[in-house]
Amino acid sequence: MKQFNYLSHKDLAVVVGGRNNWQTNVGGAVGSAMIGATVGGTICGPACAVAGAHYLPILWTAVTAATGGFGKIRK
């Protein structure tokens, strides 16, 4: 398993914006919450709608971060 890389203050100063702008990020999070609520509500009602609206944006955030959508480091 790969070890974590720690960034110094100097390294953090060269972090640039990601591929997404804030509108894309807000739209993605809201859209994933709506889809999660719809799919969860269809499967087993209000309880699953709440769970879907909560957990799908978390999954969307993890996938977006893992694929570099939030930012990259300039070398």
From Swiss-Prot:
Propeptide: 1-18
Tree of life domain: Bacteria
Entry keywords, A to Z: Antibiotic, Antimicrobial, Bacteriocin
Example GO BP: defense response to bacterium
Family classification: Belongs to the bacteriocin class IIB family.
Function of the protein: Heat stable bacteriocin active against Enterococcus faecalis and other Lactobacilli.
Oligomer and partners: This bacteriocin depends upon the complementation of two peptides for activity: LafA and LafX. Associated with a 180 kDa bacteriocin complex.
UniProt name for this protein: Bacteriocin lactacin-F subunit LafA
